[in-house]
Amino acid sequence: MAIANKNIIFVAGLGGIGLDTSREIVKSGPKNLVILDRIDNPAAIAELKAINPKVTVTFYPYDVTVSVAESTKLLKVIFDKLKTVDLLINGAGILDDYQIERTIAVNFAGTVNTTTAIMAFWDKRKGGPGGVIANICSVTGFNAIYQVPVYSASKAAALSFTNSLAKLAPITGVTAYSINPGITKTTLVHKFNSWLDVEPRVAELLLEHPTQTSLQCAQNFVKAIEANQNGAIWKLDLGRLEAIEWTKHWDSGI
């Protein structure tokens, strides 16, 4: 997918990886970049507008833990204004295994709810034009960081959901792929809590190993958007972009 002249909704587009990715996206010249985030950041929005004044950058406050009905209501405002949306990026995430319910609500249920809401506008069974979804998951969806099992499981769930969305594309007209960053230098990983304090130094220990910058991750994210491969499981780690082959151990047969 060429980003130029497209209408893009980016949930959590002002976060660590999110903001750098938003910067790279506006450089590629979309028609509209609509950022949905929990906390407004006027300085960041102004910066994005300045990077490419030809791009219309707008912000709406949004908490992914709201109901599908509330999400649909906000999306209707956006669709009424833009008429069409080409790409939805679901990027909300928290890393704090003290907050069990919120971790699941943000990292998994939030992705499901926002995706479910946009189907009201995209699903070809309802006369919609289809669309593309990029879900930010994590390499912990492949193999857990076992000291943060709640976070890791929430990302594995989001990855499984995304893989199913891709298989449903012939029915819905909506394609999907996952973005799975490795350990990236953002505020998310500088300090966080392990489950039941099983490893108080988990953040410190992780950062002793090779990481990548959020800019490296963002640049590869844009490459994945441009590749636009339905069902792709992209690993963005150590500054590299790699498509993962998923091993099938069981099949429902339906």
Swiss-Prot record:
Keyword match NAD: yes
GO molecular function (one): alcohol dehydrogenase (NAD+) activity
GO biological process terms, semicolon-separated: alcohol metabolic process
Chain sites annotated for binding NAD(+): 10-33
GO cellular component, one term: cytoplasm
Gene3D superfamilies according to UniProt: NAD(P)-binding Rossmann-like Domain
Keywords: NAD, Oxidoreductase
Known catalytic reactions: a primary alcohol + NAD(+) = an aldehyde + NADH + H(+); a secondary alcohol + NAD(+) = a ketone + NADH + H(+)
Residues binding substrate: S138
Active site: Y151 (proton acceptor)
Class of enzymatic activity (EC top level): oxidoreductase
Protein's UniProt keywords contain Methyltransferase: no
EC numbers for this chain: 1.1.1.1
InterPro entries: ADH_Drosophila-type (IPR002425), NAD(P)-bd_dom_sf (IPR036291), Sc_DH/Rdtase_CS (IPR020904), SDR_fam (IPR002347)
Family indicated by similarity: Belongs to the short-chain dehydrogenases/reductases (SDR) family.
Record's subunit section: Homodimer.
Name of the protein this chain belongs to: Alcohol dehydrogenase 1
Gene that specifies this protein: Adh1
